[in-house]
């Protein structure tokens, strides 16, 4: 028997079968809330594999994270909400929008310029104007012991002080 390379569609189909009437009793009864911690656990396991530079384990953990994404999308699809296609459509649109230096007429020659542009576009997208609004965008589920990445702190300060990109780059 020939080994077939599975696709994202195969994973969606597997999750759909597991949640079907003749599927797995455990998978069938799960909700967003009941598997919330599973999503976090898989993300932390992927982060741990990165920290340990264990690429074989990272591959496995990324699969587990992807399975969680598909699982949540399938739950929502069953409830008449968004689909996995909507998730993919949304992230593709976001990546294109936030990379105008690649997909449009924007300009960014350094990683720092990309981050500044990214955060400005995100601010515009989310209609965040004040430091309070920026800080309110920090996820409530973020554990208190986990510091924000340095660029998030810089972002909040830059937006609060309304320093222009030109001023920042000229210093």
Can you annotate each of these PLM segments?
Residues 1-61, 67-171:
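Flexible "arm" and connector segments at domain edges
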